[in-house]
């Protein structure tokens, strides 16, 4: 790998008006890519997945260069709610095995350990990200859905996950609310300040010897003479292997970089909101042990505490006409329904970001989507489709992507490789997605 030489001064990146941008420690000072560089592995995207890949490559002794359009954590990695959840949005382990056989079993093991992987990495490198491994709770929003909790506890317990079934009284005591009908608790989950974590990952990657270039949007990707070349406005990186780790923001590249990937992933806008600091007397009655919480509503009911007594929640990713002003009142009313003791709710921070959804999760909301690792060509890989569960998963997938570049056998990977499936009607799906909320509400109201 050639030495980093970027020195250009460019306009600073504009950050969203988020709680995380206001509270995260500064990230590392990074150069712009100028000139032609070489590396063993080129990584496009400095979010959780790209940075995790770089860290795992450097721990293998492999040269890694990361190219980022803005700054580490600028995209979804630094904008999300920060919940560390070691499951998919709806699938149980048996569904993964039905779809992928032995590869599904390997993925289940990867997913089972994903939250612990994240917290272990944070502890190992001393990343200051307000990490709290207090567990993740999924309460059920109707009596009939208690059998979902029973099934999930049974299936996850069978593969060694530390999960516990909670009856209605236990959920009420744990969360400080009597609106739910039971649920289950995974002790390995929790929450982080996601932007602080992304910046911490960048620091770790640099200390391990990776190169990271910021404010350097990729403008083309090509392959010749058994090498991949990623070009930016002022330079290029040529490498034996390529990782495209842009997920929901792949669409920004459209036809220029990976058109099949850009036409497959569906970026859906998701809103996050942080209340004003809540008094200790009230805070100790709402999720007193500070677990991360997201229930069984498809409309997305979720909440967690930050380090400053702010309750961090959000609105549905598919709220027609969604905007910061439009969401304040309905989300405030929701919090008051869940926790009447909270009183009047005011939000200090409201921000948004894109979630990478797979088409199956949008076109068939009763059948949640699977994440995918695609092979772009020899030694070229991409992943898409977090479907709202990328925080924990992306760290473990970074390890798997690092392994793919070093010739790991397909039958050992935690997620099977697949070919991209560009969607001919992607533009239509993107336009109608914001209006799926009425359907989601009907599905939520239907007892099972």
Model-flagged regions — what are they?
Residues 1-41:
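Extreme N-terminal leader/targeting segments of oxidoreductases
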Residues 84, 124-132, 218-220, 235-378:
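Active-site substrate-recognition segment that forms the wall
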